Swiss-Prot record:
GO terms for biological process: intracellular signal transduction. InterPro entries: ARM-like (IPR011989), ARM-type_fold (IPR016024), Mo25 (IPR013878). GO terms for molecular function: protein serine/threonine kinase activator activity. This is MO25-like protein 3. It comes from the Eukaryota. It comes from Caenorhabditis elegans. Belongs to the Mo25 family.
Amino acid sequence: MFITTWCSNDAPDSSVPRTRSKTKFTPKVRDLLFHCRYEIVDIVDEGYDMPASIGFYNDIIREFVTDDFCLTSLFEDNGQDSNNIQHRNDGCIWSIFDRLMNTNKFRDFDVIQGTFDTLQIIFFTNHESANNFIKNNLPRFMQTLHKLIACSNFFIQAKSFKFLNELFTAQTNYETRSLWMAEPAFIKLVVLAIQSNKHAVRSRAVSILEIFIRNPRNSPEVHEFIGRNRNVLIAFFFNSAPIHYYQGSPNEKEDAQYARMAYKLLNWDMQRPFTQEQLQDFEEGWTHQKKMREEQLVRTCFHDNNPRLPKVNHVYRTRIIPNQQFLREPLKFGNPFRQ
């Protein structure tokens, strides 16, 4: 039934679409895919071990999850078949993470890449359904991702950090991000991954740490951890970023990222967010200062305080000396003068 459904694609050239072709299923075929949902669940659960089958399976899953009911059936799977007989210990989503944690079975990067592509297809097609699944299974989901970012396979580490970065930057996952980033164990894993000798792991981990630094409402434990290790992180980023410009190479890009992180840590405010009373006092003081400046009761410029100096417009023009390589001919200094 499943092969019949897949071969019923309305492409005029071939009965079975190619791996990279864009499938166009009719509503009737979508209904047949929903009836084949248990077969799809078995495919997601078993996975693939050959690079040649990755694109074929991901095309099927990509088309399957476009329907909300089909996607919900993946998230609600608990190991039962169509006859409600328990033939698996867990759902198909957790089987994907279990395969990633068993790194001894992976010998090809294409298989790992295809597995993370499957996760991206499932979790980022419908953010609402994925967010409900994560919130209902948040402790286990956090523990699973923590194991992946702490594993010995650097490729799985980098892909796990990328998955978390896309998950945190989605606006619909605000509540999940807040609960997740309140855990002090998570930021410790991120800081540990920054010291990795793999460029892909370091760059992804720094992106996650940047979210921590920009968050004004960190938990007290996370806030204390950043404040206690702030100087160490600043010294690490400055020592790791000897180049403070970017001209396109990957090393210079990483140096620019490290320099930006050191600058943000230098400007990081260690005070807690303002209370309502402190915010009101600040606004009153700012309004009073603004009124005084408008009435010219406070002189803000040295020239205004000294009436003997001529008035200036505070616009300073500087002439940049041109680079010698852009001149038409080199500079000529002539012969030295002899007495």
